[in-house]
């Protein structure tokens, strides 16, 4: 089982959601199913089928969260030196063709939000960046094609999740 790096805040939120689903929501759904079952014929009982569907979705979420929390490796990126790109690093890249500057922060898969500049450590882009130093040249494959960037800066900034 491969560990997945994760921020403490994310681990706490996922663990709380898992506990809520297991200790509260399961009981609520079971009660709704029992009440719907008492309404009679199960073949044409919309309330029963809706509750069973909801139960299936909830159990799938419980299984997913159990896996993610079980594989989590809580990491505090503020303790790293960030002289090389690593988990939690914010990387400032400069496009060699346009001199346009972009910033990405390497986070766990559960925390990624590419539109906000938070990229998963498992993403192809992060895999290229991990281990690189300031001044290194990297070639990234983007939706718009291949681009070459210079790593202008690697730093740690507190990570704010949405």
Swiss-Prot record:
Gene name, Swiss-Prot/TrEMBL: greA
Keyword Chaperone in record: no
Species name: Sulfurovum sp. (strain NBC37-1)
Swiss-Prot/TrEMBL GO biological process terms: DNA-templated transcription elongation; regulation of DNA-templated transcription elongation
Function per UniProt: Necessary for efficient RNA polymerase transcription elongation past template-encoded arresting sites. The arresting sites in DNA have the property of trapping a certain fraction of elongating RNA polymerases that pass through, resulting in locked ternary complexes. Cleavage of the nascent transcript by cleavage factors such as GreA or GreB allows the resumption of elongation from the new 3'terminus. GreA releases sequences of 2 to 3 nucleotides.
Protein family: Belongs to the GreA/GreB family.
Stretches assigned to coiled coil: 1-28
Pfam families on file: GreA_GreB, GreA_GreB_N
Keyword annotations: Coiled coil, DNA-binding, Transcription, Transcription regulation
Molecular-function annotations in GO: DNA binding; RNA polymerase binding
Statement: the UniProt record of this protein carries the keyword Transcription: yes
Domain of life: Bacteria
Official protein name in the record: Transcription elongation factor GreA
HAMAP family reported in the protein's UniProt record: GreA_GreB
């Amino acid at each position: 089982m491969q560990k997945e790096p994760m921020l403490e805040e994310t681990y706490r939120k996922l663990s709380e959601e898992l506990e809520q689903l297991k200790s509260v929501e399961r009981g609520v759904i079971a009660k709704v199913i029992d009440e719907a079952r008492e309404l009679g014929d199960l073949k044409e009982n919309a309330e029963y089928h809706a509750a069973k569907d909801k139960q299936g979705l909830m159990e799938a979420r419980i299984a997913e969260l159990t896996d993610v929390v079980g594989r989590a490796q809580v990491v505090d990126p503020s303790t790293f030196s960030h002289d090389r790109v690593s988990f939690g690093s914010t990387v400032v890249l400069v496009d060699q063709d346009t001199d346009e500057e972009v910033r990405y922060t390497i986070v766990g898969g559960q925390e990624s939000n590419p539109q906000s500049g938070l990229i998963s450590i498992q993403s192809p882009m992060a895999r290229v960046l991990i281990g690189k130093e300031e001044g290194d040249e990297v070639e990234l494959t983007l939706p718009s094609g291949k681009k070459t960037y210079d790593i202008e800066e690697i730093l740690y900034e507190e990570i704010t999740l949405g």
